Every structure is written in C-alpha cells, then in structure tokens.
UniProtKB/Swiss-Prot annotation:
Subcellular location: Cytoplasm
Function recorded in the entry: Has a role in meiosis.
Protein name, entry field: Meiotically up-regulated gene 74 protein
Organism: Schizosaccharomyces pombe (strain 972 / ATCC 24843) (Fission yeast)
GO cellular component: cytoplasm
Length: 285
C-alpha cells in the first residue's frame, strides 16, 4: 500500500508539472478522488451501518403511512379532513347529498362568485376555453348567471363589498363602474379607493373632534357646577345679611321711639319747672 501511495503521488506531481496552470483545478479534484478511495475499512463499515439504519427508518415510515387510513393520520392535514367530514355529514350543503355531481341554483346566492367558486365552470378569455380541474361542463344555472363567460378580473371587481365590511361601501363609484364596463381608465379605480379612504379618514377626524368636544363640554360642565356652588353660597350669605338688616331696622325704630319719648319727658319737665328756671337765670344775671 505504501508503494502504491508513493507511485500515485509521483504520478500526480509529474502530471501537474506537465499540465499548464489552467488545469490545476482538475488535478486537485483527481487527488481528492484518490484520497476518498483510500479511506479505512472501519470508516466504510460505519457509513454502511448508518445507511442501513436510514433505509430501515424510511421503509418503516412508508409502511406506517401506507397502513394508516386518512382518519388516523388526520394530524397531517387537519384542515382538509375537517372539510371532508363536514361534506360527508352534509353540514355545509344541507339540501344536497353530493356537492360534486349536482348543479346548484345560483339565484339563492347573493353573489355569483360564491356559487362559481363551488361549482365547475368554463372561463372564456381571449377566445380560449379553460376547463375546471374536474373536467365537467357548466350547468344551465351557471350559463344563466350574469358572470358566466366573463374574464377573471371581472369576478374580482364584482365581488360584493358586504363581504369585506362597510369600509368598502363607497369604493364602487360611477367611475369604477364605467371601468368595469370598459368605458373608463384604471386610474378611476385608484381615485375611488383613495376617495373612500379619505372619506373614512374624515369620519375618524369627526369622531376625534366629537371626543374633544365631549372633553371640553365635560370641562365646561365642571366649571358650571363650581360657579353654581359659588352662587348658592352667595345666595345663602345674602339671605343671612338680609335677616341682619331687618333686625337692625327694627332696633332703629325702637331707638327712635325711645328717643321721642325721652324728648317729650324733657319738654314736659321744662314746662313744669319753668318758674324755677327763670329765677335761676335772674340770679346768675
């Protein structure tokens, strides 16, 4: 083995010396191949064991998947199994036993798109017919529908805004309807969408202003309550002052009457003792 290795190395060195610089990559690859061939037997045996184990795991998984039914491996596709169970129980279409074979009346649906999504149909676009995956032809009810034979973008544009809430109620304006019938330009739809968004923005602004008005009104109501309390206190004080004024008036009247009575007594006393007063005046003079 050692001789074989040395001979191989010498051969490779000679080969590299003989080859130009552009062929060095190929020589390196060949050296790698030679090294791979010279692996030990133990490493090869370990790799073989690992490969056998992997083969056993894969085969066991395949057998498990083949033996198990769709109900037992429902955890792999939960959504599909739930839909299949609903179809089997008839909870989605209670009036029909098989939804694949029978054709449904589209007049019961508020929107033709829901019915066309559940039944096979043919879409004619650019003079080409595209069959559904099931390969069935459309029924008479589908042919009588207004959406039959229209291109795909027609279904997208004619979806009812009720499916998406009231936010799209103002999207389909006159310009957008003209565009659907081929009379307008694509910019009309953009303008209608932006107009609806701006309209919603205005509603939001109005709501904010209403909230601000409510806050301001609450502040005003608080100020009004404070002023009313002050007025009540002032009224109470005024009533107390009025009571005091009335009492003072009564006291003044009593004092005035007493003063008049004292004045009368003094005058009567003077008149009674006028002779004595005259004598006293003469003595002083």
């Amino acid at each position: 083995m050692k001789k074989h290795k040395s001979s191989i190395k010498c051969f490779k060195i000679d080969q590299i010396s003989q080859q130009p610089e552009t062929d060095l990559v190929f020589t390196k690859r060949s050296e790698c191949k030679v090294k791979d061939e010279l692996f030990s037997d133990k490493e090869n045996s370990i790799l073989c064991k690992q490969l056998k184990e992997l083969d056993l795991v894969v085969s066991s998984n395949k057998e498990f998947l083949n033996e198990k039914t769709s109900d037992q491996i429902s955890f792999l596709k939960p959504r599909e199994t739930v839909v299949e169970k609903k179809l089997a129980n008839g909870s989605i279409w209670p009036n029909e036993t098989s939804h694949l074979d029978k054709s449904r009346d589209l007049s019961s649906h508020s929107n033709g798109l829901d019915a066309l999504a559940m039944t096979p149909y043919i879409v004619k676009e650019n003079n080409k017919t595209h069959l559904s995956p099931r390969g069935n032809y459309p029924s008479e009810a589908e042919k009588s529908c207004d959406f039959y034979g229209q291109p795909l973008h027609f279904y997208r544009e004619n979806t009812s805004p009720c499916l998406y809430g009231s936010s799209l109620s103002n999207v389909f304006t006159e310009k957008s309807s003209d565009y659907r019938h081929g009379l307008g330009s694509p910019t009309s739809l953009v303008s209608s969408n932006t107009a609806s968004k701006l309209h919603l923005g205005r509603k939001d602004i109005v709501k904010l202003s209403e909230l601000r008005n409510c806050i301001n009104s609450s502040k005003d109501s608080n100020q009004i309550q404070e002023l009313e309390n002050l007025l009540r206190k002032e009224k109470q004080r005024n009533t107390e002052h009025e009571k005091i004024i009335r009492r003072m008036k009564k006291e003044l009247k009593e004092l005035h009457s007493q003063f008049n009575f004292a004045k009368k007594l003094f005058i009567s006393a003077l008149s009674a003792n006028q002779d004595i007063l005259d004598k006293m005046n003469d003595e002083f003079n």
